[in-house]
From Swiss-Prot:
It is an enzyme of class 2 (transferase). Belongs to the class IV-like SAM-binding methyltransferase superfamily. RNA methyltransferase TrmH family. RlmB subfamily. The gene is rlmB. GO terms for cellular component: cytosol. This is 23S rRNA (guanosine-2'-O-)-methyltransferase RlmB. It comes from Neisseria meningitidis serogroup A / serotype 4A (strain DSM 15465 / Z2491).
């Protein structure tokens, strides 16, 4: 089936079992495994009427292409994973916090960004279809379950999407070494969409032009840049910190 993709490891499989079990086509469990985590997966799969097959380690290694699978591999129907941005925005109980990835094509970076986004309570991660890694087994593994919990939305025209976000009252904040404000000295808006470019080229020109603010992250050492997931974690954490302070003063 063209829309199927594998996921592997307990974090990814368990997250999918609890968040979107109907998207799971089948599971493969390593023969002889009977630990508590495996029993939990088997019990949940049985409750959801998901097909389970038992296979030897060589078979699972072949399916996961040598990646660490922990004895559990699943196949999901990716067509049942589609989320509309409008639905996300219209069903929030707090001001939106979004992460936009412009040109992040490495699956390890995408997975790390999704994990960071989940930790910081990001409501959706957005990326252009033509300049993104796309969800795959590597992304799911690195994300440690976050690829199954954080909506990942790819769009055909990122510039148009940025304009649409502004119509919802969301500020578009770009990260840039030459930004006109630094992260620790700017009053961040309640509704925010942070844009991260890739480590080599940064944001594309048109993306930059749609930003309401350009913010730099202060650097105190000798390196000139950080991994995109680290940068994302810093700006998202600062956004959450400022929200907490505002709520305490309200």
């Amino acid at each position: 089936m063209a829309n199927q993709r594998p996921i592997y490891g307990f974090h990814a499989v368990n997250a999918r079992l609890w968040q979107n079990p109907k998207s799971i086509v089948e599971l493969y469990i390593q023969e002889g495994k009977s630990d508590a985590r495996t029993r939990e997966v088997l019990e949940k799969a049985a409750n959801e009427n998901i097909r389970v097959y038992f296979a030897d380690a060589d078979r699972l290694n072949a399916i996961s292409k040598g990646a660490r699978h922990q004895g559990v591999v699943g196949f999901i129907d990716a067509s049942k994973n589609h989320v509309h941005l409008e639905d996300v925005l219209e069903n929030l109980s707090e001001p939106p916090l979004l992460l936009i990835l412009d040109g992040i094509t490495d699956p390890h970076n995408l997975g790390a960004c999704l994990r960071t986004a989940d930790a910081m309570g990001v409501h959706a991660v957005i990326a252009p279809k033509d300049k993104s890694a796309g969800l795959n087994a590597t992304v799911s593994k690195v994300a440690s379950g976050a690829a199954e919990t954080v909506p990942y939305i790819t769009v055909t025209n990122l510039a148009r999407t940025l304009r649409e976000l502004k119509e919802y009252g969301i500020w578009i904040i770009g990260t840039d070494m030459g930004g006109n404000a630094d992260l620790y000295h700017c009053d961040l808006p309640d509704s925010a969409a942070w844009v991260m470019g890739n480590e080599g080229d940064g944001m594309r020109r048109l993306t930059r032009e749609h930003c309401d603010m350009l913010v730099s992250i202060p650097m105190f050492g000798t390196v000139e840049s950080m991994n995109v997931s680290v940068s994302a974690g810093m700006v998202l954490s600062e956004t959450r910190r400022q929200r907490v302070l505002k709520n305490e003063k309200a």
